[in-house]
């Protein structure tokens, strides 16, 4: 057992006492836990947790799939970055690569972008992001395309397609030291194509 795991129940108890949540759901299922010899765990730790939760960030509404979504279903660490795009997107065409739930794309639409295209390789992510666009009344401004962002960027570059703003928020390309060089090439490629 990891020291962090040994304090898990203390954290749950503190959250219940201070925050009074409807439920707490554990997502200790990232692959790196296996590398560290830790068990991958998911499940309700307290109360009840619906399949989807609606949240609001910077005035934008999102459905979040806590149980099946990537990692926790929403990347809260990018909140300030999503807010920071506001002065750059009004009246602009925007491409959001690796869109996941559409968080950057929907913020761009909310902040007045003329047209937004979100790209993700996952059909599930694109469907979920499309639902989020409808939830915000942005379905006529924000659209999602299921595609490999590397391939799409290359195709659009060859075709001369241009966007006023390109957002790149890729997943981690490496989890191990041995893959660092390949990751560098990947990051360089997407930045050159953008």
Q: Where do the model's predicted regions map?
A:
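Non-catalytic substrate-recognition/targeting regions of SAM-dependent transferases
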Residues: 7-74
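Rossmann-like S-adenosyl-L-methionine
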Residues: 47-194
